[in-house]
Amino acid sequence: MAPLLGRKPFPLVKPLPGEEPLFTIPHTQEAFRTREEYEARLERYSERIWTCKSTGSSQLTHKEAWEEEQEVAELLKEEFPNWYEKLVLEMVHHNTASLEKLVDSAWLEIMTKYAVGEECDFEVGKEKMLKVKIVKIHPLEKVDEEAVEKKSDGACDSPSSDKENSSQMAQDLQKKETVVKEDEGRRESINDRARRSPRKLPTSLKKGERKWAPPKFLPHKYDVKLQNEDKIISNVPADSLIRTERPPNKEILRYFIRHNALRAGTGENAPWVVEDELVKKYSLPSKFSDFLLDPYKYMTLNPSTKRRNTGSPDRKPSKKPKRDSSSLSSPLNPKLWCHVHLEKSLNGPPLKVKNSKNSKSPEEHLEGVMKIMSPNNNKLHSFHIPKKGPAAKKPGKHSDKPLKAKGRGKGILNGQKSTGNSKSPSKCVKTPKTKMKQMTLLDMAKGTQKMTRTPRSSGGVPRSSGKPHKHLPPAALHLIAYYKENKDKEDKKSALSCVISKTARLLSNEDRARLPEELRALVQKRYELLEHKKRWASMSEEQRKEYLKKKRQELKERLREKAKERREREMLERLEKQKRFEDQELGGRNLPAFRLVDTPEGLPNTLFGDVALVVEFLSCYSGLLLPDAQYPITAVSLMEALSADKGGFLYLNRVLVILLQTLLQDEIAEDYGELGMKLSEIPLTLHSVSELVRLCLRRCDVQEDSEGSETDDNKDSTPFEDNEVQDEFLEKLETSEFFELTSEEKLRILTALCHRILMTYSVQDHMETRQQVSAELWKERLAVLKEENDKKRAEKQKRKEMEARNKENGKEENVLGKVDRKKEIVKIEQQVEVEADDMISAVKSRRLLSMQAKRKREIQERETKVRLEREAEEERMRKHKAAAEKAFQEGIAKAKLVLRRTPIGTDRNHNRYWLFSNEVPGLFIEKGWVHNSIDYRFKHHRKDHSNLPDDDYCPRSKKANLGKNASVNAHHGPALEAVETTVPKQGQNLWFLCDSQKELDELLSCLHPQGIRESQLKERLEKRYQEITHSIYLARKPNLGLKSCDGNQELLNFLRSDLIEVATRLQKGGLGYMEGTSEFEARVISLEKLKDFGECVIALQASVIKKFLQGFMAPKQKKRKLQSEDSTKSEEVDEEKKMVEEAKVASALEKWKTAIREAQTFSRMHVLLGMLDACIKWDMSAENARCKVCRKKGEDDKLILCDECNKAFHLFCLRPALYEVPDGEWQCPACQPPTARRNSRGRNYTEESTSEGSEGDESGEEEEEEEEEEEEEEDYEVAGLRLRPRKTIRGKQSVIPAARPGRPPGKKSHPARRSRPKDDPEVDDLVLQTKRISRRQSLELQKCEDILHKLVKYRFSWPFREPVTRDEAEDYYDVIEHPMDFQTIQNKCSCGNYRSVQEFLTDMKQVFANAELYNCRGSHVLSCMEKTEQCLLALLQKHLPGHPYVRRKRRKFPDRLADDEGDSDSESVGQSRGRRQKK
C-alpha cells in the first residue's frame, strides 16, 4: 500500500540486502546507499503530485497521502467487520461499474442479508438470546421470490370490491404499524448493543428531519452455529436473527473499496482489480486474464519489452494499439502452454466423447487437429489452448467459448514468430485465418481420430533426418523462460511444477536431453514419476505388493549405504577438525590489537595484576571477609586510592581493616603480640590498622634481649615467601603511615596480607563449608530427580494396567452403556410426551429443572474449587522449585568462587586471557607473564603429548597458572599427536583490555580452530560469551570517585578525641582520679606533636586506680593469707615471688612508656593507647551501674560498687547506711561472711580490713588452692577473655571466716580432713555461716536443675541426652577419657552431688568438650553442640547472671579438656602454627 503518483501506483524501493542502510526516509523506511538518490527521492516526495489511494484526495505530498492512508486503515479496522470483506470484494473484483454503483449495491447486499461468518443473536423465546455465527445461506425459494416481486409491485390483485379493499387496507395498515413498532424496538436494541464508531458520522445521518427506515432482510434461511457449543442449527429464518454489530455505512464502504482495489484504466468501463494478497486470501474468482486487468501493476513489476510486429505487410495497422500491446506483451504465464484445463463440455456431447475409441486427452486431440490445420508443422507450436476461468463453468454461456478460444488463439498466433523455414510466407499468414474461421471445436473433436496420426507420422521423418541446428519445441522454450523468471519466487512454485509436468509429458527423449542441465534433471525426474504412475495404474494388487516390497528393500539398502558414507565422512571431518597443530605454524588472520588497561598516573600497568589479585580475593571470599554485605571493593576505586597522595586514606584503611579482622581472629595469629599483649586484644580501627599491619607482617616478634641476636642471625638465611614482605617496606612503616607509601609498596603489603589470610584456618573452614553445601545441594537435586523419575515410572505402570483393564472390560461396558442410553432416551421421550399435557406436569418439570440446575451449579462450584486448589498447589510447587533451583545455582556458584581462579586460555603468542568477577569487569589479556621462577616445559609420552608445568613451580600470584597446557588433547586418543614447539617469551608484564563486543567477535573470528592453544581458548570464549559480554557492559559504567580526606589530619583529630573519651569515661566510671578534666581536654586539643601526646597518654595511665588495671599493667596481687606461726619460710618465698612479678610488671610498663615516647607515627600512638584501653577494667565502671536496692541510676558520687560481685549500691540505700566511701576493698552485705557482718557493726571498715590483713596464717594446702585459682585466672587471660571467675573465688573465700582480733582463726581444709574447732562459739558461727551459704547454694542448684531440664527438652540437644554406647561408636571410650552426658548430670543433681554452680558448669563444659574432641569438623553433632551451648548461655544469663560461663575452644589438640580443668600451654600452640618465633 502506497500513495498514487497521479492515478498510477508508485512502487517503493526494495530493502537493501544484508547491509546497513546509510540514508533512510522516515515515514516509508526506504533505504538508499547514496545521498544523491536519497535527496532526489525526498525532493519528489515533497512535491504536491500525490494522490491518496483510500480517499482519492489529490495534490498532496507523499507524507500527507501516506498518513491519510494509515488513518483510513485504522478506521477500517474499527468500523468494518471482517465478515463483510469477502462479500464486498467478490462484487468489486473485475467489476466495470462505477464506484457509486458499487457502493450502493454492496450496501444493499449487506443490509438485506446476513454474511457468512457474521456473529449475531438467535432469538429463542421472548427473553432468551443465543450467541450464534452464520455458517451457510440457503438460496431463496421460488415462492419467496414471487412474494418479493409482488411486494415490490405494490398492486392489488384481489377482485373484491372497494369496500372490501378498504377494510383489508385498514387491517394491513394496523399490521404494518405493529410491525414497524417491533422493527423500531428491535433497531433500538440493536443500536444499543452495536459498537459505536469513534469517527464522526456523515452529515446525512445527523439530520433529524425525516425518519429513515433501513431495508428489510430478504427471507433467506440460514444455518447457524452456537458460539458456546459445537452445534449447528439449520434453516433458521431471518426474522429470528438479530444483528448485534452495526453494518458499515456507505462512506466506510467507499473507503474500503478504494483502499483494497484499484481501477485498471481511465475509461468509464475500466474494471476494478483487488490486491493480489486479498485475491489469494479469499480465492476471488477472476473474470479476465491478469495482464489485461492490471496493466499498471504489471508495468511496475515487469519493465516493458520491445514490442513485436504483430501484423502482416498486407494488413492494416491496429486501431487500438493500447489494447493490442497489453495483450501481446503479456508475461510468461503457465496459461500460455501446457497448463490447460479443458472441460468435457467443450468437446461436444458426453456420449460422443465416451464412444470415441481414442483414449487420448482432449488437449492431445486439440493439438492433433491443429497440426493438421497448419500448413507447416512448425506452425503447431504457436497454437494456444486457453485456460477457462470460473465464469466458463456457469450454465448458459457455452456459446461464447469457441469464440473466446478462437480469438485468443488468433491473437497469440499473430503475436509469435514462425520457428521453421517456410517456403511461402503468404501462405503462412493467410491459411490460419481461413481455417480458424471455418473450424469449430465441435468439428475438431469429431475428426481427431483420423487427423492426429498423419502429422505425427509425417513429422517424424524430417525430425530424424533433420538439419543439425534443430530448435527446441515451444513448450521447452516456454519452460526455460518461465523457469528463469520464476525459479526463486515462492508464489510461483505450484505453477512452475505444473509447467514442468506438462513439458515432461510432451517432450521426447531427444528434446529432454537437449534441455539445460538444471532443467534436464527436473524434467527427467518428473517424466520418470509420471511413467511410474502409469505403470502403477496398470499393475494388479499382487504386483503392487511385490513392487513395494522390492522398493522398500532397495530403499533400505540405499539408506544404509548413505548413512554409512555419511558416518564415514563425518568421522573423517571430525578427525580432521580434531587435529591440533602449533598455533604459530598455522596461517590465518592476525589477532586484533587491544588497548592497554587504563591506570591512574603513578600506578604502572605492570601492577594491575596485583590489583586484580586483591580485589578478586575480596570478592571471592566476601562471605567470610564481608559478611555484613558492605559495598564492594572495586578495581577502579582501589587503583585511584593507591595512586592518590592523601585521598586514599579512608579507602585503603578500610581494605586493611577487612583483611585484619579475619587474620587476627584466627588461630594462626594467637602468638602475634606486642609488649606482652596479643594483637587480637588491641582495638582494630581505621587509625590503628597501619601499625597493626606492620606488627602482623613482621617475620618475627620482638623477643627478649637474649633471643634478639639469634633472631637476627637466622633472619637472612630463611627463604622469602609470598605471605611475607621485605623488611625495608616494614621499616618504612615504622616512620610513615601506610597511605604515605608508594603504590608498589602498598600493593606488596596488600598481596602479602591476602596470601597470609589464605593460610588461615578460617579460609580452610570457609572453603570446606562451601564445598559441603555444594555436595548437599547435589544430593538433594539427585534425590528430587530420583523421586520424580520414580513417580513417572509408577504413573506409566499404572496407566498400562488401566489400559489393559479397560481393554478387557471395554466391550461389555460399551454394549451395556448403549442399551442403557437407549432406554433412558425412550423414557425421557415418554415422560416429555405425557407430562406436557397439563399444568401439573409443567410445574413438576420446572421444579425438576431447578433441581437439576442447582445440582449442576453445585457440581460446577465443586469442580471450580478443586481446580483452584490444584492451581494453587501447582503455583506453590512451581515457586518451591524455582527457589530450590535458585538456591542450587547460588550454592554451586559460591563453591566455585572459593576455588583457584584460572585463565580462560592462551593464544598463539602465549598471552593469557582472564575473566574476573564483576568488581574487575572486562576481558583482560596478560602478556609477558613468565618470569625466572617458572620452568616452562612439557613431557613427551608414547601415546599422547601433554604439556605439564614443573612440579616445583611456585606461583607468583593467582595469575601464574599453567592449567591451559595440561593434557589438552588427551581424550582424543593416540591419533592426535599435537606438540607445542614454542614457549612463552620473557618480557614486561602488560595487561590489555577487550572492552567492546565488536572486538570480542573479531577475536573469535581470528582464533584458529585447529591451534593447540587457540582452539581451546575459542571454545571456552564461545561457551562463556554471555558472561563476557555482561562483564564488558559493566566495564563501561562510570566510577563514582573517592571521598577526599587528609590522612594526617584525620589521625590527629581521632587521637585527640580518643584521649578525651578515655579520660571522660575514667572519671565518670570512678576508675581513675584526674584533676582538672576540662584543663586536660583543652591541653589535648591544643597539642600537635607526637611527644606531647605521649606524655598525655602516660599521665592518663597514671591516673587509673591500680585495682582497675589488668593485663601487663596490673601486678599479680595475691590476697594476704592466714598463716600459722611455723610458716615463715613459705612467707619468705611468697614475698620473693611477689617481688619478681612486680619487677616484671614494672619492666613491661616501662617498655610501654618507652614505646610511647619513641613512637614516630600516629597509628603507633593509637595502638599504644589501645593497649591502655584494653588494660582498664571497664566492666567495673559505675557509669552505667544501677543501685541494686532502688534500681535507679544517677548520683555517681554516692554510688559504691562491691569488689566481689561488682553490684552497685547507693550509700544511703545500705542498711546500716554509709556516710562516705570507704577506703580499700569493700564488699556488699551479701558477699560479706556472716560473722564479719555481725561483728562489724559500729566498726570502721578500715580497721577491719587491716586486722584481717594482719591476723592469722594459712596452711600449705590452702596455698595450693590459691595457686590453682591464680592459674585458672591466667588461663582466662591467655584465652583473650578479660573476665574474672569471681564466683569461684568468692565461693572459696567465703568459707574462710574473718576471725576476731586476738583469736586464732579456723583452718580451711578438705572436708574429709577438717579438724575439730577449739571453741564452741566459733563452731556456732561456722554452723550459721554454713546454713546461710547452703540456703543460697540450694536455690542456685535448683535453678541449675531447671536449666538442665529445659536443655533436655531443647530439640538440638538429642546427641547429649544419654551416654554414648559402644554400639554407636566403638572407639568413643578410647578417645574420650571423661565421658559425660545430660542423663548423668541429671542423676547427680537428683542425688545432691553438686555443692556449687561451678561444679555443674564444669560437667556441662565436659559434655561440649567431648563432642568437639570426638566429632569431625562439619558434622551434624557439632552444629547441634553449638546451638545447645548458645541455648545454655542464654539460660544462664537469664537465671544465673552472676555466674560467667567461659569455655576455651582449642581446635588443634585432640587431648584437650575443659578450660577450668586442664592447664594447657599456650606457647606450644603459638609455636606450632603461624609465624615462626625463632628462625
Swiss-Prot record:
SUBUNIT field: Component of the WICH-1 ISWI chromatin remodeling complex, at least composed of SMARCA1 and BAZ1B/WSTF, which regulates the spacing of histone octamers on the DNA template to facilitate access to DNA. Within the WICH-1 ISWI chromatin remodeling complex interacts with SMARCA1; the interaction is direct. Component of the WICH-5 ISWI chromatin remodeling complex (also called the WICH complex), at least composed of SMARCA5/SNF2H and BAZ1B/WSTF, which regulates the spacing of histone octamers on the DNA template to facilitate access to DNA.
EC main group: transferase
Function: Atypical tyrosine-protein kinase that plays a central role in chromatin remodeling and acts as a transcription regulator. Involved in DNA damage response by phosphorylating 'Tyr-142' of histone H2AX (H2AXY142ph). H2AXY142ph plays a central role in DNA repair and acts as a mark that distinguishes between apoptotic and repair responses to genotoxic stress.
Cross-link (Glycyl lysine isopeptide (Lys-Gly) (interchain with G-Cter in SUMO2)): K827, K854, K1043, K1089, K1107
Localization: Nucleus
SUPFAM superfamilies in alphabetical order: Bromodomain (SSF47370), FYVE/PHD zinc finger (SSF57903)
Primary residence: nucleus
Pfam families cross-referenced by the UniProt entry: Bromodomain, PHD, WAC_Acf1_DNA_bd, WHIM1, WSD
Domain DDT: 605-669
Name this polypeptide is given: Tyrosine-protein kinase BAZ1B
Biased composition (Acidic residues): 1254-1277
Zn finger limits (PHD-type): 1184-1234
GO CC aspect terms: B-WICH complex; condensed chromosome; nuclear replication fork; nucleolus; nucleoplasm; nucleus; pericentric heterochromatin; WICH complex
Catalytic activity: L-tyrosyl-[protein] + ATP = O-phospho-L-tyrosyl-[protein] + ADP + H(+)
Enzyme Commission numbers on file: 2.7.10.2
Cofactor requirement: Mn(2+)
Glycyl lysine isopeptide (Lys-Gly) (interchain with G-Cter in SUMO1) crosslink site(s): K827
Positions where Phosphoserine occurs in the chain: 152, 158, 161, 325, 330, 345, 361, 374, 706, 709, 717, 1315, 1338, 1464, 1466, 1468
